[in-house]
Amino acid sequence: MFEKKFDFYSPINLKSYNLDQIIRYQLDILGKLDPFTKRHSENVANLCCRLCEYLKCKKSFTVHCTIGGYLHDIGKMFIPPEILNKPGKLTDEEYEVMKTHTTLGYKLCMGDIRLRPYALFPLDHHEALDGTGYPNGLKKKDIPYSAQIVRVADEYDAIVTKRQYTTHVNISETLKELIKDAQPDPRFLALDQLATKEKYGKINGTILKNLFKVVIDDILFEISGIMDYINYLKDQIKRLEMIESYGKKADNSNNEKTKEYYHEGMRLLFQQGETLENYPQVLQEYREAVVTRKSVIDQLYSEIKIIKKLRI
């Protein structure tokens, strides 16, 4: 049995993570202005919680980081909609405006005593270990570990959302992109990183490795769901095959009462929308659906093998 994925936004988890009314109020405002960003924040919070579990973080840190993941983009409520929701690439000027969501979110949190403990999440989640991030160009250990976790979760969900994945097939391609961000930029290898024998990319490689585990969990969860659906399809196929056998017996009988007996049995087994005329097509569609789903499962297991071989 596979455990269900953590649903951060459920009332049970909101209670267990002690999100007080002021935080929910701020998030409701964010959702009203930009549902897309709110959903992204929910996904990041979910990932942060699960990453912390794999990183064996203390519960208090996990709670803090999970809430921080939810609040990391709260500054976007101040970004003009025409920039925030622009479908194409931002201009340099628009990008500079977009970057201010970090400082705006920080100011919002610092202005409210209940949000203040989470103020560094909006501020630091775009900082990079190699110093190329914003807004302050922090490096290495100057970036809070919690913000490093949020950055990995944020980048992963941003790529997955942009590509509109409906399955984890080919999800390893997303992880390969993140691996590039965990590796040092070749342009900097001749500089101070090489001199100190320290090589940093933009994101934390250890956190990324644990993201691999989270993704594998999600793949197994998807496989479990597909297998449940296949079992349902098999039950339907079994029922329709029984109908098919009754139909053959009716066709082979010369007795009208016997024919009607089997036809009545067929009608009793029909579900809504099924008839004597269309059930063979329905049966064929179910059989094809099983083959298709089994193929997806094979692809998903292949993804797991690929992910397990990934190196940072």
Outline where the language-model segments fall.
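Histidine- and acidic-residue-rich, metal-dependent catalytic cores
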Residues: 2-311
